[in-house]
C-alpha cells in the first residue's frame, strides 16, 4: 500500500509505479527518467551484458510503458523518457512489443564531457525519446532534435542520475496539461511541472529520494505563488486507492 502525499497541485506516491499507476486518473503527459539497464547483468566494466539480458530487460520496460500509455488521455498525450545509447535497444524492443513506436529521438548535448572508459570516446550526450499518443504533435515545427542543456559532475540533490531542471522544463513546455513521472527520483520533473503551473503526479519507491522530492516540490509551490509565501503543508495517507482510475 503506497503512501500518498499531496502538496498543492502535486500528488506524490511512495511505492512501485507498476502498482500505483493503474490506480491513477488520466494525465496529459508522462515525463520520466527510468533506470537504465534494469534486470540485466554487468560484465564489470559498466556495460550491459549480452543480447539475451537486454531482451529480458525489455519485458520490464514494456510493462511500465504500457501502464504509462494507459494513463494518457485517449485523444491527445505524449511521453518523454530519458535513455542512453546502451539502453536504446531495450527501449526499442519494448516499444515494438507494445506497438507504441518512438516518434522522435532527441539528442541531449550536455555541454560537458564525462569521464568515459579507458578505450572509447568520452560521453557528452544522452537521448530523450518522444512517444506520441492520439493527435499529439509538437506545436513548434522548427524545433530541432538536438538540444543543449548544460550539466556538470555536481549533483545538487545527490541523486546519481539527476537531470538538469532546464531539460525537464523543455519537456514540460512542449507537453500538454497534467504531468506524470513514474520514476520521480529527487523530483526534478515535479519542480518543472509546478513552476509551469501544471498538475503533477509522481511515484518513487526509495524513501530517501521521495523525501527530497517532497521538500523540493513544496519549495517550488511556495516560490511559484506570490499569494502563498509559505510552502503548502503536505498531507499524507497510506491509501493510493483513493485516487480512482479513469
Provide a role label for each language-model segment.
Residues 5-7, 214-227:
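Short, conserved SAM-binding/catalytic segment
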Residues 129-137, 227-236:
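Short, basic, helix/turn surface patches
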Residues 3-203, 208-211, 246:
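Core catalytic lobe of class I
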Residues 15-19, 230-239:
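Conserved SAM/SAH-binding loop
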Residues 26, 67, 228-229, 241:
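Generic detector of low-complexity/intrinsically disordered segments
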Residues 1, 239-246:
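Intrinsically disordered, low-complexity and often Lys/Arg-enriched segments
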Residues 202-203, 222-227, 243-245:
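Asp-based, Mg2+/Mn2+-dependent phosphohydrolase catalytic module
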Amino acid at each position: 500500500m503506497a503512501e500518498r502525499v499531496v502538496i498543492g497541485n502535486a500528488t506524490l506516491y511512495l511505492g512501485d509505479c507498476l502498482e500505483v499507476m493503474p490506480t491513477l486518473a488520466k494525465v496529459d503527459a508522462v515525463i520520466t527518467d527510468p533506470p537504465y539497464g534494469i534486470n540485466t547483468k554487468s560484465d564489470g566494466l559498466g556495460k550491459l551484458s549480452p543480447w539475451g539480458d537486454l531482451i529480458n530487460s525489455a519485458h520490464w520496460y514494456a510493462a511500465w510503458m504500457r501502464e504509462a500509455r494507459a494513463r494518457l488521455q485517449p485523444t491527445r498525450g505524449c511521453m518523454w523518457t530519458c535513455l542512453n545509447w546502451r539502453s536504446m535497444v531495450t527501449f526499442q524492443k519494448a516499444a515494438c512489443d507494445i506497438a507504441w513506436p518512438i516518434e522522435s529521438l532527441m539528442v541531449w548535448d550536455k555541454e560537458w564531457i564525462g569521464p568515459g572508459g579507458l578505450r572509447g570516446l568520452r560521453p557528452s550526450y544522452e537521448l530523450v525519446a518522444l512517444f506520441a499518443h492520439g493527435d499529439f504533435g509538437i506545436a513548434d515545427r522548427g524545433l530541432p532534435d538536438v538540444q543543449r542543456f548544460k550539466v556538470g559532475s555536481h549533483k545538487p540533490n545527490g541523486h546519481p542520475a539527476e537531470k538538469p531542471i532546464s531539460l525537464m522544463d523543455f519537456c514540460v513546455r512542449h507537453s500538454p496539461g497534467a504531468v506524470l513521472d513514474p520514476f520521480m527520483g529527487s523530483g526534478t520533473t515535479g519542480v518543472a511541472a509546478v513552476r509551469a503551473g501544471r498538475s503533477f503526479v509522481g511515484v518513487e519507491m526509495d524513501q530517501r529520494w521521495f523525501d527530497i522530492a517532497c521538500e523540493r516540490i513544496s519549495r517550488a509551490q511556495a516560490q511559484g505563488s506570490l499569494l502563498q509565501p509559505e510552502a503548502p503543508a503536505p498531507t499524507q495517507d497510506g491509501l493510493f486507492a483513493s485516487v480512482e482510475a479513469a
